[in-house]
Amino acid sequence: MARQSKRLAPRRLKRKVSKGVVHIQASFNNTIVTITDSSGGVLAWSSAGACGFRGAKKGTPFAAQTAAETAIRQCIDQGMRQADIIVQGPGNGRETAIRALQLAGVGVSLIRDITSVPHNGCRPPKQRRI
């Protein structure tokens, strides 16, 4: 019979971080919120799909708000007080996720939009016919 190994240390280390960076990736289909420390190590993440939304509901502003609240709650428990926000993508949940972070009690010192805009690069896909 195989021997079971016991885990000695907890899986996720709780770190005390006072300032972090919140990355919001908002597409039309989903919103992903990742919170990192200043060096880029991931502290917490959440997405609309991970919060239980499925299908077209993942792209809604309410789903983005729920994902942001879930992620920031984990970081407030680790002692986060200040955050920079980096937003990427054209999705519906951009503004709602930012508002949810501000209402959660974390001081926002910077909001940066890094959405890439093509200077007429690749040809877009064909138009949908419904």
From Swiss-Prot:
Its main location: plastid. One of its GO terms (molecular function) is structural constituent of ribosome. InterPro entries: Ribosomal_uS11 (IPR001971), Ribosomal_uS11_bac-type (IPR019981), Ribosomal_uS11_CS (IPR018102), Ribosomal_uS11_sf (IPR036967). GO terms for cellular component: chloroplast; ribonucleoprotein complex; ribosome. Keywords: Chloroplast, Plastid, Ribonucleoprotein, Ribosomal protein, RNA-binding, rRNA-binding. It is found in: Plastid, Chloroplast. It comes from the Eukaryota. SUPFAM superfamilies: Translational machinery components. PROSITE patterns: RIBOSOMAL_S11 (PS00054). Gene3D superfamilies: Ribosomal protein S11 (3.30.420.80). Part of the 30S ribosomal subunit. PANTHER family: 40S RIBOSOMAL PROTEIN S14/30S RIBOSOMAL PROTEIN S11 (PTHR11759). This is Small ribosomal subunit protein uS11c.
